[in-house]
């Protein structure tokens, strides 16, 4: 497997709709000149943005977190330009970008250093071959302080690895349960 470059990412996004909406370069400022946490195409990856809808874990309903029987009451919904994650807590968001992963590509997501240096960890499972949708992002605030996530700004980087041969069975072939997700998607059993 080889990591794919900015040229490949641009080609796949512009010619095959792999990423929509798509920024062909790095965006660091708004049109008004305000600094943002960068997003868009980088040398060997694509920095994604998160949307304005967040789900923050809460214990006000005394729910137990069970991935096989998930209770939506475990979350408080927040909509806005920022999300404040309580100390040592967790939130979900989604990418503004919609992805269509090619059959011979596996995509890995890593957090951006700007957030990592603040104790905010981004976790995303791999985007498997032929998966498509908006990515659900998992943010962990590992600090004893509240942490701020900025919507419409860079939060994580996607790395694309192309195999020398296509897989026998893709995510689409097996009817993966998160295919086509749009917005924050909770665990499905």
UniProtKB/Swiss-Prot annotation:
Enzyme kind, highest EC tier: hydrolase
Domain of life per record: Bacteria
Binding site for dCTP: 112-117, 136-138, 157, 171, 181
Pathway: Pyrimidine metabolism; dUMP biosynthesis; dUMP from dCTP (dUTP route): step 1/2
EC number: 3.5.4.13
Nucleotide-binding in keyword set: yes
Function comment: Catalyzes the deamination of dCTP to dUTP.
Subunit structure: Homotrimer.
Family the entry assigns: Belongs to the dCTP deaminase family.
This protein's name: dCTP deaminase
Source organism of the structure: Halorhodospira halophila (strain DSM 244 / SL1) (Ectothiorhodospira halophila (strain DSM 244 / SL1))
Taxonomy of the source species: Bacteria, Pseudomonadati, Pseudomonadota, Gammaproteobacteria, Chromatiales
């Amino acid at each position: 497997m080889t990591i794919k470059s900015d040229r490949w990412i641009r080609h796949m996004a512009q010619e095959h709709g792999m990423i929509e909406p798509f920024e062909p370069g790095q965006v660091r400022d708004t049109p008004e000149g305000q600094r943002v946490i960068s997003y868009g195409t980088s040398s060997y990856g694509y920095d994604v943005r998160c949307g304005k809808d967040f789900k923050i874990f809460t214990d006000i309903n005394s729910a137990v977190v069970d991935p096989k029987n998930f209770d939506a009451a475990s979350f408080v919904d927040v909509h806005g330009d920022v999300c404040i994650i309580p100390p040592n807590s967790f939130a979900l968001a989604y990418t503004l970008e919609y992805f269509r992963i090619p059959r011979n590509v596996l995509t890995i997501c890593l957090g951006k250093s700007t957030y990592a240096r603040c104790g905010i960890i981004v976790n995303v499972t791999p985007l498997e071959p032929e998966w498509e949708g908006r990515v659900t992002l998992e943010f962990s605030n590992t600090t004893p302080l509240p942490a701020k996530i900025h919507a419409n700004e860079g939060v994580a980087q996607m790395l694309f690895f192309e195999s020398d041969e296509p897989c026998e069975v893709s995510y689409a072939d097996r009817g993966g349960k998160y295919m086509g997700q749009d917005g924050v998607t909770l665990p499905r059993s």
